[in-house]
Amino acid sequence: MAAAHVILVSDSHLSASAPQAQANWDAVVSYVGASAPDLVIHLGDLSLDGARSAADLRHGRTQLDRLPAPWQAVPGNHDIGDNPWPGALVGSAVDAARHQRWLDIIGADHWPVTVGGWIVLAINAQLLGSGLAAEAAQWSWLEEQIGRHRGRRPVALITHKPVTATGSELAAAPPYRFWPPPARGRLARLFGGTPPALVMSGHVHQYRLLRLDGTDHLWVPTTWAVLPGHAQPLFGAKRCGIVSLTLTTGTPAQQELIEPDGLEQLTLTIDLPDPYHS
């Protein structure tokens, strides 16, 4: 089977009120037009505040539709709200209305796609631990998909939040950075002794490739702005950009960090104000 070229994009934080985010997005659109990928996947936080603003989410949809290539997307915490966790701000959690708004404006929040002989399973990580009916339905779907494809073709996962990290990183992390531990354990049990070949995530605004227990964990950087050192430790590379991914049957995934022409390297609180903690 021929190789498939996929562009991975994440954490764009788009809004009509965010010109810096828009300028960097324009650079992504131009790069996609020049590189002609088979698919573009957005890994969440498409919008600046879609969890509270339907206008931001609609703006994000308009920008996705500008891409001169087929696209798919999963929601992030700023699109539909976060996983419930102790100490979270009141009103920050995902709920049924926010979830439905994503479905109405953007489309499916979890989906399978076959590219380059691989099966890519996209998961709505924001539902995990929510107790919503949609969470149970997604787990049932995921179990069926894993059972169908595990051992038959390479399996890759798409999720906004990283599933895991090193033991020391997990121990030191705030509860909102990675998957909730119960969900992480349930995923491992579903895969059993045949883990996914690749897990792709965003959320952390850093580029990283980490191999753990037979799985490559690829962190896709932000197209908007990285976080300063006092707000987040360094895990990989704090660079704004996208990832070019090549998938071929029988070959490990090939990936490369891309910094498109015109995409500015920005740091939150230094180069632009923090809209979430002002």
What is each of the regions a protein language model found here?
Residues 149-168:
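Short acidic, glycine-rich surface-loop motifs adjacent to enzyme active sites
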Residues 1-59, 63:
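N-terminal active-site segment of His-dependent metallophosphoesterases
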Residues 19, 132-134, 229, 262-272:
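A short, polar/proline- and glycine-enriched secondary-structure boundary/capping micro-motif
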Residues 10-13, 44-46, 77-79, 125-126, ...:
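Active-site metal-binding loops of divalent metal-dependent hydrolases
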Residues 52-154, 174, 181-198, 212-213, ...:
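Extended active-site neighborhood of metal-dependent phosphoesterases/phosphodiesterases
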Residues 6-8, 40-42, 73-74, 157, ...:
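Residue-level marker for buried hydrophobic side chains located in beta-strands
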Residues 1, 198, 243-278:
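A short C-terminal boundary segment appended to hydrolase-like catalytic domains
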